[in-house]
Amino acid sequence: MSQTENAVTSSSGNKRAYRKGNPVPARERQRASLARRSNTHKAFHAVIQARLKDRLSELADEEGITQAQMLEKLIESELKRRATL
């Protein structure tokens, strides 16, 4: 069997239609993401010392999580620590 025959038989199924539309702008994607999380999450903005921000980033990277997840973890850890005092 030649290669052209193999190519025809291996791709004999129907191909799906081209579905890619216009890309969604980043601002709109972010708005949709925030809307999905609005019931369980609240926005948080803080200005902290650069060295502490760098350490937060390092801690999050070591754990393989986002900085937001690292902040949640640190807060939960502190709440548990205070409950045992």
UniProtKB/Swiss-Prot annotation:
- What are the record keywords, sorted? DNA-binding, Plasmid, Plasmid copy control, Repressor, Transcription, Transcription regulation
**Species assigned in the record:** Escherichia coli (strain K12)
The record's Gene Ontology biological-process terms are:
plasmid maintenance
Question: This protein's superkingdom?
Answer: Bacteria
What is the designated name of this protein?
Replication regulatory protein RepA2
* Its biological purpose: This protein is involved in the determination of copy number in gene replication. It binds to the repA promoter thus inhibiting the synthesis of the mRNA for the initiator protein RepA.
- Please give the residue ranges the record annotates as the region Disordered: 1-41
The reply on keyword Transcription regulation is yes
**Polar residues composition-biased segments:** 1-14
Keyword DNA-binding part of the UniProt annotation: yes
Q: State the disulfide connectivity.
A: none
Q: Offer an example of a GO molecular function term for this protein.
A: DNA binding
